[in-house]
């Protein structure tokens, strides 16, 4: 059974979203996703300052099994990327909801972020999607 924390939002593309402030979120891939990928060997992330559009690709996770695209869960600007993944991409496997985070994003406004998060899955909905 994979871990699905109740306090996060989820996408059908297996990303998690944690609200970190009025207009900010942290993004990563779920425990289910990392278990399906196998050993992660490389993570390609966008540059800080990049503008992401909800539903568009923003990077890749490469594992011993495959290369998978990362999809932006919300429209926002990249304010941080996890540089630790350059030297230790396996953090995505060992701690997908903690040290294995991918990017921090900032939405244009709290209202925009509220609306975007309302469109995502909750833990129960994501659990149903992975059964």
From Swiss-Prot:
Domain Lipoyl-binding: 24-106
Keyword hit for Ribosomal protein: no
Cofactor(s) needed by this chain: (R)-lipoate
SS bonds (residue pairs): none
Database matches in Pfam families: GCV_H
N6-lipoyllysine: residues carrying this PTM: 65
Function: The glycine cleavage system catalyzes the degradation of glycine. The H protein shuttles the methylamine group of glycine from the P protein to the T protein.
Keyword hit for Glycoprotein: no
Name of the protein described by the UniProt record: Glycine cleavage system H protein
Family label: Belongs to the GcvH family.
PANTHER family (alphabetical): GLYCINE CLEAVAGE SYSTEM H PROTEIN, GLYCINE CLEAVAGE SYSTEM H PROTEIN-RELATED
GO cellular component: cytosol; glycine cleavage complex
């Amino acid at each position: 059974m994979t871990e699905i924390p109740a306090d996060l939002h989820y996408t059908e593309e297996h990303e998690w979203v944690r609200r970190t402030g009025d207009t900010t979120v942290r993004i990563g891939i779920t425990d289910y996703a990392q278990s399906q990928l196998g050993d992660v060997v490389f993570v390609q992330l966008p540059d800080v300052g990049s503008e992401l559009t909800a539903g568009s690709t923003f990077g890749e996770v490469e594992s011993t099994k495959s290369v998978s695209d990362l999809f932006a869960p919300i429209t926002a600007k990249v304010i941080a990327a996890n540089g630790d993944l350059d030297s230790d991409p396996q953090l995505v496997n060992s701690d997908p909801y903690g040290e294995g985070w991918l990017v921090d994003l900032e939405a244009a406004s709290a209202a925009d972020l509220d609306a975007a998060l309302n469109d995502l899955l909750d833990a129960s909905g994501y659990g149903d999607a992975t059964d």
